């Protein structure tokens, strides 16, 4: 990646073993010690799982980090497991697990009917995602995604694609904010149109969405017997009538966090102040509210823009 070599973005970059590798922690600890690193922003999902597991097993980390409990992280990075925990709440769409080698594939997806939405149960950036119109398309999609061990099929939801960010710290929900993903960077290279990187989005004020997200998180915390601690992005998709359903819960910041910050939702700064024990930080709950009509535009290797939707060229 070009930007890894840009000294204006990073003081130093390293190539390290992947999370889970036997030499991973030795290298991470060496870097932390060498640079006296006090805090880490841990992502993507595999890194979060690895760090959360280390914290659970060892009781400490090389430096401070805001992490969910390990069991909770496991449940949330598996979309099938997360959906199953919430299946009786009305907050998730009707869904079925799809085993690629199953002899009852047609019978399984018949519960949903066509079209439906398919994706991998784990992974990010829209891995394995497609609107499936018929059985032939389903079988072809499974065939060209041989590395996906399990899919989840869900009711097709044609409405808005929403995200609700939630910052929990030591048992309290402290900050929240919402946005809409409208278009994706390089959308044409993915059959589903979803690449995981938003190119055009809206910053929204949606207290009802926050309410649903926090109720769902309450159940997920309880199921995992986990403390309310960590940073989460709850993704929603609306049906044709505008009813939102939870499609996944990310255990990390998402790519357009900088756009939230530009609009005033400074989650990264909040996290640093909390981890640093800043006594002046206001721990009363706050949903960040944005000015009306705010949108953001992003692209590869370019600074994002924040402007009003009314300013877009017609």
Segments from the language model and where they lie:
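A conserved helix-loop-beta module that forms one wall/lid of the active-site cleft
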Residues: 59-128
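Conserved ATP-binding module of the ATP-grasp superfamily
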Residues: 92-94, 115-117, 127-160, 217-224
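Glycine-rich phosphate-binding loop signature in dinucleotide/nucleotide-binding domains
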Residues: 31-37, 111-112, 146-147
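ATP-dependent carboxylate activation and anion-phosphoryl transfer catalytic cores
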Residues: 35, 207-314
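ATP-dependent carboxylate/phosphate-activation module, predominantly the ATP-grasp catalytic core
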Residues: 155-161, 165-222, 250-275
């Amino acid at each position: 990646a070009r930007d890894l070599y840009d000294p204006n973005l990073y003081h130093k970059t390293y190539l390290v073993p992947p999370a889970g590798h036997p030499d991973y922690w030795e290298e991470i600890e060496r870097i932390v010690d060498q640079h006296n690193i006090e805090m880490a922003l841990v992502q993507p999902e595999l890194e979060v799982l690895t760090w959360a597991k280390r914290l659970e097993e060892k009781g400490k980390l090389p430096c401070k980090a805001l992490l969910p409990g390990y069991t909770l992280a496991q449940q949330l990075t598996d979309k099938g497991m997360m959906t199953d925990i919430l299946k009786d709440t009305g907050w998730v769409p009707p869904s079925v697990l799809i085993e690629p080698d199953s002899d009852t594939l047609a019978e399984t997806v018949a519960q949903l009917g066509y079209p439906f939405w398919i994706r991998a149960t784990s992974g990010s950036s829209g891995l394995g995602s497609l609107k499936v119109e018929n059985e032939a398309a389903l079988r072809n999609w499974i065939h060209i995604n041989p590395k996906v061990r399990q899919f989840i099929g869900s009711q097709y939801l044609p409405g808005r694609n929403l995200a609700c960010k939630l910052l929990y710290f030591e048992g309290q929900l402290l900050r929240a904010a919402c946005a809409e993903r409208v278009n994706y960077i390089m959308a044409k290279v993915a059959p589903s149109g979803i690449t995981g990187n938003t190119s055009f989005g809206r910053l929204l004020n949606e207290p009802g969405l926050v309410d649903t997200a926090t109720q769902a998180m309450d159940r997920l915390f309880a199921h995992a017997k986990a403390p309310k601690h960590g940073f989460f992005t709850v993704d929603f998709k609306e049906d044709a009538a505008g009813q939102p359903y939870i499609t996944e819960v990310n255990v990390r910041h998402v790519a357009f966090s900088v756009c939230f910050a530009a609009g005033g939702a400074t989650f990264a700064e909040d996290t640093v102040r909390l981890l640093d024990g800043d006594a002046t930080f206001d721990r009363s709950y706050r949903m960040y509210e944005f000015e009306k009509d705010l949108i953001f535009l992003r692209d590869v290797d370019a600074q994002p823009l924040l402007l009003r939707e009314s300013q877009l060229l017609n």
